[in-house]
Amino acid sequence: MVLSHLSLPFLLPLLVSPLSCTSRSPPSTRGVVLPRAAQPAVAAGGLILQDRPFAVVWNIPTEDCHRRYNVSLDLGHFDIVENRQQRFHGQEMTIFYRDHLGKYPYLSPDGSRVNGGLPQLSDLSAHLSLAMTQMSGLLQPNFSGLAVIDWEEWWPLWERNFGTKMEYQRQSKLLVRQERPDLSETETTALARRKFEESARRFMEETLKSAVRVHPKGLWGFYGFPACLNKKKKTDKSYTGRCQAGTEDQNDRLSWLWRQSTALYPSVYLPQSLAGSTDAALMVRHRLLEALRVASVWHHGNNTTQAIPVLPYARLAFTHSLTFLDKHQCSLLRDYVHTVLGPFVQSLSSDMKRCSLQLCNGNGRCARQRLTSSPAMTSDSKKTNVLTGSFNGKHFHNNFMCECYPGWTGQECHHGNRQKRK
């Protein structure tokens, strides 16, 4: 899981360990039922996740808390992965915004075109050249951390550019009319859509390909992908949390993106309107289920055994409720980490390790037997201690299964391949 953005200047990501996309349910690529695994799936990889049954990754620029206000967060004590000196960009976790990776084309608020404005007007070669230079300046050659590309100005699917993003549709159609004034409105829209989507695909796909080629050990993916579009509306009389109708078909059309990604980073940011509501769990649940569905169907390159990590982005605050880390905010954050979040992560990590040892001989991580089932590592105080408690072995065996780390096989991950583990 990644802890993510503060509203304006900061990303506050906390990344928790890769979620499992293995299931013993009947095969399907629709809904929440995921494919049957004949053999235990190989656990999602990446050196930062290697041999870790559970991981939380910090991506908040809290270096300023110590440097400016002498407020220190002892993240290492709680086994939370952090960049050196808690820097925003580092070798464990980094994020690239629109103006910090190549020449990303977008329309400014006043309508002017930046780097061509539209994907079909961008200079892909110049973009890739600059992007590679920027990556080399920021990342070490052996970089093996989390690498997130955060481009949110437009979507690669035409119909998902609604609201203010419809300007990309309007200007794309205007471009076609200038080139082909003989076409009807329907023909103009169809051609504009095709050119936009083809160019958007090429831009995103080639960016990922280049990044993975130069830093193959990194976990590369786009923030907010796959999407679910399940925000609760004021008009909703009953909220199920399910993804918007047509979401799965749209995400299936992005198979080219999933095949180039080495990690998926769905957003589970909670809006203020869901504070204290059980609907928050429904929203998060279905966003993660859709990401797991995508990860279960497509794999990076030709790797058909190792799962793509699903690393949800979460905030420590509700969206748009914080803007800047002043001394007071830093103190509140420190207290929250030291008294609530840190102990919870520590206790949950302990249970995950215990499950790994009991079920998987310490050579894999535990995953629910059925993703839609309710058993979890956390429960009520009658069965466990106050935080995450200590489940007995029977609970683990009845509700969880193993995803073996690379180099291990078998239902209990007890068969080792020394050559693979080197």
Residue ranges and their predicted role:
Residues 353-363:
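Disulfide-braced loops of extracellular cysteine-rich modules
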Residues 149, 264:
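Conserved, mostly hydrophobic/aromatic
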Residues 79-81, 131-134, 242-255, 285-297:
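Alpha-helical scaffolding within the catalytic cores
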Residues 222-255, 271-277, 282, 320-321, ...:
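Non-catalytic scaffold segments within catalytic domains of secreted glycoside hydrolases
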Residues 253, 259-260, 266-320:
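Glycoside hydrolase catalytic-domain groove-lining segments
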Residues 2-5, 10-51:
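N-terminal signal peptide
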